Design a protein with these regions (language model features):
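ABC ATPase nucleotide-binding domains
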Residues: 67, 80-206, 210
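The feature captures the beta-strand-to-loop junction immediately N-terminal to the Walker
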Residues: 34-36
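Non-catalytic connector elements of ABC transporters
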Residues: 231-302
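ABC ATPase nucleotide-binding domain helices that frame the ATP-binding cleft
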Residues: 42-45, 127
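Helix-to-loop junction immediately C-terminal to a conserved catalytic motif
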Residues: 49
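Short beta-strand immediately N-terminal to the Walker A/P-loop
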Residues: 31-32, 68
Length: 302
């Protein structure tokens, strides 16, 4: 294991920010700590980075050197790319050679004399990553790396950062409030709410097999509370899913018929609220339909 945490808690006065956190991260794994504002995710990251002390902890063990990549990259705007990276190598005897290796590895050799405000967001991310790993870290901590970015840039930077992390064979922990970031980047997701970990699973397990508490908070999930006739094939499937299923688990087909109650245009999809017998639920479809129209649908077998 790269990181193991057992029974970690953190209090700020009478406020308990983290409660009995148990977490493990394997070497080479990418873990996202997912949660909303006030969930405790940033506090947990700061404790792992040793920027904050836990109020109590049975043990916290990290196998290798830790580096942190901050939300705004924390690059020095008055220094050029080369000097930003050299800042992390101030006490290294072979810092010139390490610098050359990093510039080549991250494909930023042509940027070495440019200042930070002269390069793109993607290039700045590469520089920040190069500086973070300059001292030979084994565990990289990422603090909301994609917040405040437009959607196109965010998608590009996610792909780029994931590729770089895999290439460097580094273990990474990212805190984020954006579930799309977590689904896209992660091997595992720890879902944090009000200082407690509600779920620790791979992205598909979290979406397709969430527990009830997680499903109440996670987006794009239907929770069915009505009594169902389990002789009905669709209702039997819902029961097999513990009465929780995703909007994207249904498609147009010929097995079941529902009536459209509401629709919202989301760009690539329409979010439809439909009624089937005695239950209402949501589904995502690419085609447009009219209100009160009947549609035939089926279950997607993932």
């Amino acid at each position: 294991m790269m990181l193991e945490i057992k029974n970690l808690s953190k209090n700020f006065g009478k406020i308990q920010a983290l409660k009995n956190i148990n977490l493990h991260v394997k070497e080479g794994e990418f873990l996202s700590i997912l949660g909303g504002s006030g969930s405790g995710k940033s506090t947990l990251l700061r404790i792992i980075a040793q920027l904050e002390q836990a109020s109590s902890c049975e043990f916290l063990k990290c196998k290798g050197e830790v580096a942190m990549m901050f939300q705004n990259y924390a690059l020095f705007p008055h220094l050029n790319v080369e000097k930003n990276i050299l800042f992390a190598l101030y006490d290294k005897k072979d810092k010139k050679q390490i610098l050359e290796d990093l510039l080549k590895t991250f494909e930023i050799e042509n940027l070495r004399y440019k200042k930070i405000d002269e390069i793109s967001g993607g290039q700045a991310q590469r520089v920040a990553f190069a500086r973070a790993v300059a001292r030979g870290c084994k565990l990289l901590l990422l603090d909301e790396p994609f917040s405040n970015l437009d959607q196109n840039l965010k998608q590009d930077l996610r792909r780029e950062l994931k590729k770089l992390i895999q290439k460097q064979k580094i273990t990474a922990i990212m805190v984020t409030h954006d579930i799309e970031d977590a689904y896209c980047m992660s091997d595992k997701i720890a879902f944090l709410d009000k200082g407690e970990i509600l779920a620790h699973a791979n992205p598909k397990e979290l979406y397709f097999k969430p527990d009830f508490k997680s499903a109440q908070i996670l987006p794009d999930l239907n929770i069915i509370e009505e009594k169902l006739d389990l002789e009905d094939e669709f209702f039997a499937w819902i029961a097999s899913k513990n009465y929780i299923f995703g909007y994207a688990e249904l498609k147009i087909g010929n097995r079941f018929e529902a009536t459209i109650l509401q629709k919202e245009f989301l760009g690539a999809f329409y979010r439809l609220k439909v009624r089937y017998k005695n239950i209402d639920f949501f589904m995502l479809l690419s085609s447009n339909y009219n209100l009160e129209e009947k549609i035939n649908f089926d279950i997607i077998n993932f």
